[in-house]
């Protein structure tokens, strides 16, 4: 059987970033920049005050005969406006935070270091000498014209949104979101709103995968369930090929009714269909026509784990990401992993930072049908191939799915 690493490499070799498009800034969150972003002007575009206070010449703040200098207040400037006159020797202007520094002034003293008879007084005493540039934010201090601010391939988060807005990008060049078809298979599968009947199970996988696809940044399309007939699968695949990626659950094992691989071979190709891992050995990859297809196992835990290992990196590459994989950390496994499994074993666990190290505890029964083992899981402990056991208190690698708050 193929290793996890080889399977992932073969899958990703067939995946390309999708075409670029322009989206409104308000819709760019989570997408990937399709070009470098270069500042077209200085930010801030003008020198402005970092404090409420007075704009003056720094030399006018020096004491005179041991006494605080007294300056005439000739006006004021608020944020959003410009001064209608210059500051000259012996004069000053009131200034608000963010307001442009008036011509002639080379420093700003905060109001707390001044003294006036009343807020509207025409005279102010300067109680402390201040150097040139004090409390002034120079034009271009944050970004200067011609500077590359964001790089192609950067993911757009809330802070990037703020920077793009500051630079005036109302529409943003991005790699477009993938549209992903999600298809359940099997005569035994019914929808979630149907009453359970003997021999039937609810279509939990399609809803789980829909949510996982959305969290990965793509747009999911649930296509329902294909029955265990060639005709039903062909009909569903005809609908699915309008999308960028097809993800199925079930139908890729070795049973008489596991037909997905056969239809893949008929309408496209099968690259591989078994991986040396648990849970999730029966994973298939290939295509229907020119659309890549990732066939995940029918057991819900297997579908969830294999999506994290293979489906999520595929979507991230389609989105234009260059960092595709979840991070791994070294953990101490408090309760150990005693089951001997010859395949690579991904054990559901909860990892937290405790006493200067990452500590992991497994989430109970690790059967591939035990969906409750996915609850309170934020990591997968990686147990190497070959029947390796991890003793209680032993060390292992863990693939982090989320980072717990502290």
Where are the language model's segments positioned?
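Short, glycine/charged-enriched hinge/interface segments at domain edges or termini
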Residues: 2, 55-222, 359-360, 364, ...
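Flexible glycine/proline-rich
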Residues: 21-26, 30, 35, 80, ...
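Generic structural signal for well-ordered, non-membrane alpha-helical segments
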Residues: 1-4, 8, 21, 25, ...
């Amino acid at each position: 059987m193929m290793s996890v690493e080889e399977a992932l490499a073969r899958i990703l070799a067939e995946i390309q970033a999708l075409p670029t498009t322009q989206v409104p800034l308000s819709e760019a969150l989570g997408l990937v920049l399709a070009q470098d972003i270069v500042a077209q002007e200085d930010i801030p575009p003008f020198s402005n005050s970092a404090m409420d206070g007075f704009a003056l010449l720094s030399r006018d703040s020096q004491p005179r005969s041991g006494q605080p200098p007294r300056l005439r207040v000739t006006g004021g400037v608020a944020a959003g406006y410009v001064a209608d006159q210059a500051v000259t020797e012996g004069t000053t202007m009131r200034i608000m935070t963010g307001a442009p520094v008036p011509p002639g002034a080379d420093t700003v003293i905060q109001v707390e270091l001044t003294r006036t008879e009343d807020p509207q007084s025409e005279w102010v005493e300067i109680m402390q000498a201040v150097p040139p540039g004090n409390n002034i934010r120079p034009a271009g201090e944050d970004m200067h014209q011609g500077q590359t601010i964001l790089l192609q391939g950067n993911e757009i988060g809330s802070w990037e949104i703020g920077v793009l807005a500051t630079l005036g990008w109302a529409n943003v060049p991005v790699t477009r979101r993938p549209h992903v078809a999600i298809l359940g298979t099997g005569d035994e599968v019914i929808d979630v709103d149907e009453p359970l009947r003997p021999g039937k199970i609810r279509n939990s996988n399609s809803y789980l995968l829909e949510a996982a696809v959305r969290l990965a940044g793509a747009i999911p399309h649930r296509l329902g369930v294909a029955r265990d007939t060639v005709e039903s699968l062909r009909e569903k695949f005809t609908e699915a090929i309008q999308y960028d990626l097809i993800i199925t659950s079930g139908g890729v094992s070795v049973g008489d009714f596991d037909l997905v691989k056969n239809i893949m071979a008929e309408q496209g190709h099968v690259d591989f269909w078994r991986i040396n891992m648990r849970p999730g050995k029966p994973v298939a990859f290939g295509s229907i026509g020119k659309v890549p297809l990732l066939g995940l196992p029918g057991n819900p835990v297997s579908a969830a784990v294999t999506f994290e290992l293979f489906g999520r990196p595929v979507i991230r590459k389609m989105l234009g990401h260059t960092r595709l994989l979840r991070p791994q950390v070294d953990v101490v496994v408090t309760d150990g992993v005693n089951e001997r499994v010859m395949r690579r074993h991904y054990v559901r666990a909860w990892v937290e930072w405790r006493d200067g190290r990452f500590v992991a505890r497994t989430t109970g029964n690790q059967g591939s049908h035990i969906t409750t083992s996915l609850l309170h899981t934020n990591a997968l402990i990686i147990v190497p191939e070959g029947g390796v056991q991890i003793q209680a208190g032993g060390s292992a690698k863990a693939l982090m799915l989320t980072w717990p708050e502290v």
